[in-house]
Structure formats: C-alpha cells, structure tokens
C-alpha cells in the first residue's frame, strides 16, 4: 500500500482522496481475473479517477455507470466479451494482425486531382 512517509502527499485534499480511492480499487482489482468483466470495470474506474479535467471525468463516469449498474454480480468474475477500440490493448493489435491476409499488400491512397 501507499506509504505517506516515503511518497509525497498530493497538493489538495481531493487529490489525496482520489489517490486513496485508486489504491483501494487496485487492491480490490487483485481479486478478479485479468480477463474478467469486473477487472475491466475497475480499470476503467481507475482511469476515470486519474483524469484531471472534471468535465471529462464526469462524462467518462456517466458512460461507465450504466454498464456497471446493469451488470449482474455473478457476471463480474466471468471473462469479458467487450470489444475494445482503443488500439492500445494487446488483444486489439492481435486482432488487427489476424484480419489482414499475408498475401494482400496495402495500397497507397492517391490524391484526387480536380478537373479544370
């Protein structure tokens, strides 16, 4: 856990509360398998807490909240079948590599020349 004597304190009380919330969520996250729906939701919630702009965090939380509310408690430990479009996830990169056949080359995008 976080040691206040070794690490710097956040500059505001709100930052301190967010930091404690993130540490608590990371602790809970250890109890879920890494491919489960609960793990995905906890990861997204941690990302929301790390956002510095209030409006953006509020939007992301409002998008996440209905999914978490509708999820059954038993489903949180089962593997997640969510499609991620962020491009950062390893499973997304693997899928992109599999989708393109090896014998097909990429074509160049040609610019449109206007007729005058």
Swiss-Prot record:
Signal peptide location: none
Main localization category: host cell
GO biological process, alphabetically ordered: negative regulation of gene silencing by regulatory ncRNA; symbiont-mediated suppression of host innate immune response
GO cellular component term, pick one: host cell perinuclear region of cytoplasm
Subcellular location: Host cytoplasm, Host perinuclear region
Record-linked Pfam families: Gemini_V2
Keywords from the named record: Host cytoplasm, Host-virus interaction, Inhibition of host innate immune response by virus, Suppressor of RNA silencing, Viral immunoevasion
Classification via InterPro entries: Gemini_V2
Coiled coil, from the record: none
Transport as UniProt keyword: no
Organism domain of life: Viruses
Keyword Nucleotide-binding: no
Function in brief: Through its interaction with host SGS3, acts as a suppressor of RNA-mediated gene silencing, also known as post-transcriptional gene silencing (PTGS), a mechanism of plant viral defense that limits the accumulation of viral RNAs.
Assembly and oligomerization: Interacts with host SGS3.
Family the UniProt entry places it in: Belongs to the geminiviridae protein AV2/V2 family.
Protein name, as recorded: Protein AV2
């Amino acid at each position: 856990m976080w040691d206040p004597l070794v690490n710097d304190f956040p500059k505001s009380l709100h930052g301190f509360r967010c930091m404690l919330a993130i540490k608590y969520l990371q602790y809970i996250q250890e109890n879920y398998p890494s491919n489960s729906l609960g793990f995905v939701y906890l990861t997204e919630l941690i990302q929301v807490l790390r956002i510095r702009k209030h409006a953006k965090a509020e939007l992301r939380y409002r998008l996440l909240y209905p999914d978490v509310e509708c999820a059954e408690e038993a489903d949180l430990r089962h593997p997640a079948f969510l499609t991620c479009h962020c491009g950062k996830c390893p499973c997304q990169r693997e899928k992109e590599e599999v989708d393109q056949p090896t014998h097909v080359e990429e074509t160049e995008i040609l610019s449109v020349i206007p007729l005058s």
